[in-house]
């Protein structure tokens, strides 16, 4: 007798509407170069325009944030991330604050146009976070501002978009399921 086995390397299509339990709106960026910056002193959130006093980021937090954008950038070919040289103008503004509202350690807001193209986004991160918890949180929030939603924790996947987090991110490459999701969202 002869046995054969088949390995499928083509990822299946993910049904985002079923996968994400919140924060998914069917929107994405339609530009190749996306800039980001840390807010200085005060910032307003993208959608609700709530005002926050922000804390200057430490060198470690700046480096973790650069790493987070690099990790997402390595996973999606159609987008390049660049830290903005202009403190008043960036596509994504990040603020570190004391006492993020609610039970959150971070949250995001975006605005988009009638074509479901994201035009501006903000990320708020809790000041008390450090190390890999900060990195995990900023990675998750970047996933949100790229257009991905939040996933209820599951045994069959490993994703930075799981909420609450199931593990802290310590690698240098995005997890396989996250790569699959972002490539699907951006038609790669």
Regions found by a protein language model. Give the residues of each.
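Short, small-residue-rich loop/turn micro-motifs
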Residues: 38-42, 98, 150, 165
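Metzincin-family zinc-dependent endopeptidase catalytic domain
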Residues: 59-156
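Disordered inhibitory propeptide/activation segment of secreted metzincin zinc metalloprotease zymogens
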Residues: 2-61, 109-115, 173-177, 183-188
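Residue-level preference for alpha-helix termini and adjacent loops
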Residues: 28, 70, 159-160
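Metalloprotease/metallohydrolase-associated module, dominated by Zn2+-dependent proteases
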Residues: 119-133, 149-188
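A broad, low-specificity signal marking well-ordered, structured residues that form hydrophobic/aromatic
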Residues: 5, 34-35, 92, 123, ...
């Amino acid at each position: 007798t002869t046995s054969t086995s088949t390995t499928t390397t083509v990822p299946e299509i993910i049904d985002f509407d079923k996968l994400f339990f919140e924060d998914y709106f069917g929107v994405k960026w339609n530009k190749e170069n996306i800039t980001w910056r840390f807010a200085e002193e005060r910032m307003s959130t993208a959608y609700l325009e709530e005002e926050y006093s922000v804390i200057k980021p430490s060198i470690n937090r700046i480096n973790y944030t650069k790493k987070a954008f690099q990790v997402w950038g390595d996973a999606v070919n159609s987008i390049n991330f660049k830290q903005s040289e202009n403190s008043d103008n960036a596509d994504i503004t990040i603020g570190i604050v004391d006492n993020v509202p609610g039970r959150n350690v971070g949250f995001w807001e975006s605005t988009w146009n009638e074509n479901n193209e994201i035009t501006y986004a903000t990320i708020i991160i809790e000041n008390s976070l450090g190390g890999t918890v900060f990195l995990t949180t900023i990675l998750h929030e970047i996933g949100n501002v790229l257009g991905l939603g939040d996933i209820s924790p599951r045994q069959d996947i490993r994703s930075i978009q799981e909420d609450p987090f199931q593990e802290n991110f310590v690698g240098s490459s995005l997890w396989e399921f996250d790569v699959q999701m972002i490539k699907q969202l951006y038609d790669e």
